[in-house]
Amino acid sequence: MSKSALLVLEDGTVFRGISIGADGSAIGEVVFNTSMTGYQEILTDPSYSQQIVTLTYPHIGNTGTNSEDEESNSIHAQGLVIRDLPLLASNFRNERSLSDYLKSQNIVGIAEIDTRKLTRILREKGAQNGCIMAGDNLDEALALDKAKEFPGLKGMDLAKVVTTAETYQWKQGSWTLLDGLPEAKDDSELPYHVVAYDFGAKRNILRMLVDRGCRLTVVPAQTSAEDVLAMNPDGVFLSNGPGDPEPCTYAIEATKTFLDIGLPIFGICLGHQILALASGAKTVKMKFGHHGANHPVKDIDRDVVMITSQNHGFAADEATLPDTLRATHKSLFDGSLQGIHRTDKPAFSFQGHPEASPGPTDAAPLFDHFIELIKLSVNEARSA
């Protein structure tokens, strides 16, 4: 028999449903994601730290879960909100039902609520703090108090919370249908050494860099520029991650150093915002952010439209871009800035997720541009 659950927003709105995860409570910023598939990748994306994820597609859990689709070692979303959990999970890769997966990691979830109504509230009022309670002892008043007590993501440095504790090497490429996840590549197959800052990095980003010949040294978020330069990298990657970029002064200062010496830099999501801040631009908190796998973005340089995967609640403010930065991509949903490129340095970034997982791969050529910048830099160093 299903246990009861409730979701209470900070404005006092109450949704009652059934529990699909662990007993207990979860507090965070409630956001909505419009992806139809990829719920396991979404849950394990560290960028969702301190957020309760509402999935707008009505049927979630159809394909179960498996060990190969995780984007990190654990679920990072605070809680999950869905309309309907199918009785059966059917897929040849299924290892565990979504409900069991949530319970195994002590994650609270709620189903059988009106997610359309919830999404309209978030769209019109903006992202709200909320509290999910699940189990036998549900207390609306207590849940409301907890939701109101949550400080919000503005000013919250979460990159140093979700980052790796130790530096490590990554040499594994992408999953394929026939072979699954491959063995780590030999150094002889990886001609470029890239140091990747882990602000909450997704595994598929690392895999796509390896696919293009990068031997990755993944370092903690607070690693100094001096320590990175001692590793003699051919380029630096600034990963995605959760929270507000402005408090990440350690990353901003390190990026300034890399810019000064002309090291190739590629940033994604939070890394995009950090590059913007290091270059003199400002960032802003968005009303409800972009979360989904169907966001149209215009590539200004190529004059084409890409369908992209998005997951961010902050954005670089185009009005504050200095002369050394030019806009390269814009959202066709709200006109917000989606990409920048330094005019004087081999550095660029993208707000969306070119690695997808889940989502389309229209923006994957951005990885190729990073390799082009690395090749130019390496050739210039050799001829100097």
Curated annotation (Swiss-Prot):
Residues 193-380 form the Glutamine amidotransferase type-1 domain. Residues 1-189 are annotated as: CPSase. The active site is at residues 269, 353, 355. L-glutamine binds at residues 47, 241, 243, 270, 273, 311, 313-314. CDD domains: GATase1_CPSase (cd01744). Pathway: Amino-acid biosynthesis; L-arginine biosynthesis; carbamoyl phosphate from bicarbonate: step 1/1; Pyrimidine metabolism; UMP biosynthesis via de novo pathway; (S)-dihydroorotate from bicarbonate: step 1/3. It comes from the Bacteria. Its EC number is 6.3.5.5. Keywords: Amino-acid biosynthesis, Arginine biosynthesis, ATP-binding, Glutamine amidotransferase, Ligase, Nucleotide-binding, Pyrimidine biosynthesis. InterPro entries: Anth_synth/Amidotransfase (IPR050472), CarbamoylP_synth_ssu (IPR006274), CarbamoylP_synth_ssu_N (IPR002474), CarbP_synth_ssu_N_sf (IPR036480), Class_I_gatase-like (IPR029062), CPSase_GATase1 (IPR035686), GATASE (IPR017926). One of its GO terms (molecular function) is carbamoyl-phosphate synthase (glutamine-hydrolyzing) activity. The keyword Ribosomal protein does not apply. SUPFAM superfamilies: Carbamoyl phosphate synthetase, small subunit N-terminal domain, Class I glutamine amidotransferase-like. GO terms for biological process: 'de novo' pyrimidine nucleobase biosynthetic process; 'de novo' UMP biosynthetic process; glutamine metabolic process; L-arginine biosynthetic process. It catalyses: hydrogencarbonate + L-glutamine + 2 ATP + H2O = carbamoyl phosphate + L-glutamate + 2 ADP + phosphate + 2 H(+). NCBIfam families: CPSaseIIsmall, PRK12838.1. Composed of two chains; the small (or glutamine) chain promotes the hydrolysis of glutamine to ammonia, which is used by the large (or ammonia) chain to synthesize carbamoyl phosphate. Tetramer of heterodimers (alpha,beta)4. Belongs to the CarA family. Small subunit of the glutamine-dependent carbamoyl phosphate synthetase (CPSase). CPSase catalyzes the formation of carbamoyl phosphate from the ammonia moiety of glutamine, carbonate, and phosphate donated by ATP, constituting the first step of 2 biosynthetic pathways, one leading to arginine and/or urea and the other to pyrimidine nucleotides. The small subunit (glutamine amidotransferase) binds and cleaves glutamine to supply the large subunit with the substrate ammonia. This is Carbamoyl phosphate synthase small chain. It comes from Photobacterium profundum (strain SS9). The gene is carA.
